[in-house]
Amino acid sequence: GAVPCGKDGRQCRNHADCCNCCPIGTCAPSTNWILPGCSTGQFMTR
């Protein structure tokens, strides 16, 4: 099930302790310095 996360409340298929949504809808922890909340790996992609 998708969970709301990020300031826009976008539905993401995955959940993390620090959940944010990238423009492409990826839900990931805020570990990316350049794009906070965006994961550079595939382990958190939808």
From Swiss-Prot:
One Gene Ontology MF term: sodium channel regulator activity
The keyword Cell inner membrane is annotated on this UniProt entry: no
Gene source species: Conus magus (Magical cone)
Function: Iota-conotoxins bind to voltage-gated sodium channels (Nav) and act as agonists by shifting the voltage-dependence of activation to more hyperpolarized levels. Produces general excitatory symptoms.
Tissue-wise expression: Expressed by the venom duct.
Subcellular location: Secreted
Pfam family, any one: Toxin_19
Proregion positions: 46
Family affiliation: Belongs to the conotoxin I1 superfamily.
Domain notes: The cysteine framework is XI (C-C-CC-CC-C-C).
Keywords attached to this entry: D-amino acid, Disulfide bond, Ion channel impairing toxin, Neurotoxin, Secreted, Toxin, Voltage-gated sodium channel impairing toxin
List of residues that carry D-methionine: 44
Gene Ontology cellular-component terms listed: extracellular region
Superkingdom: Eukaryota
Disulphide linkage map: 5-19, 12-22, 18-27, 21-38
Main subcellular localisation: secreted
Protein name: Iota-conotoxin-like M11.1
